[in-house]
C-alpha cells in the first residue's frame, strides 16, 4: 500500500492486442475475451491484465494500453526494410491475416492524450482504425524502398524456421480502437502507406 503523498495520479500499464488471440471478427475494448489456451501471448497478457485489476490503488487512475504493432524506427522495421531493399521482401503465411497497427508518432500522441485527460481510464486499444492484411504490410514495406514484395513464406515453413513465434505472425488481429474513436481522437497517420 503506497502512502497517499507518493501515489501517482495515473498509472499506465502496457498490454497487447494479442490478448484477443486470433480474431476473425473485429474486436474492441467492450468485446468479451475468450482466452485461447493454444496462444501463449494471449494467456500472458490476460494474466497481466488480471493482476493489474487486482492491484488497483484508491485514488489512482489506471489505464491499460493494449498496443498493436508499432510502426517506427525500431529493430524489426529496420530489418524488414533491409530485407526489402535486398529484394527479399516477404509476405508471411497466406497474407490474409489482419494486422492492427499504429505509427510510433500516433502511439506517443495517444499516450499523451490518455495521461493528460483525467476522465480517461480503463482499457484502450492503441491502434489505428484501419487494420491491414499481412499482404498489404509486406507490400507497403517493400514499396517504401521502391522494391516488390517477391517472397511468400508459407505457414508450415515459418513454423519450422521460428517455432512457436510463428503464431505471432500468423494470427489475425482485427482490433478496433472504439474508445479512442468515441473520444474523437484524431490520428495523424491512419494510413499505413503514409506511416511508412
Segments (PLM) and residue ranges:
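Glycine/proline-rich active-site loop of Rossmann-fold NAD(P)-dependent oxidoreductases
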Residues: 46, 58-60, 71-79, 114-124
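Catalytic helix-loop patch of NAD(P)-dependent Rossmann-fold dehydrogenases
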Residues: 24-64
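C-terminal amphipathic/interface module of NAD(P)-dependent oxidoreductases
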Residues: 132, 167-196
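Glycine-rich "substrate-gating" loop/helix at the edge of Rossmann-like oxidoreductase active sites
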Residues: 36-41, 66-74, 94-102
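Conserved beta-loop-beta element that borders a ligand/cofactor-binding pocket
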Residues: 10, 15-16, 50-73
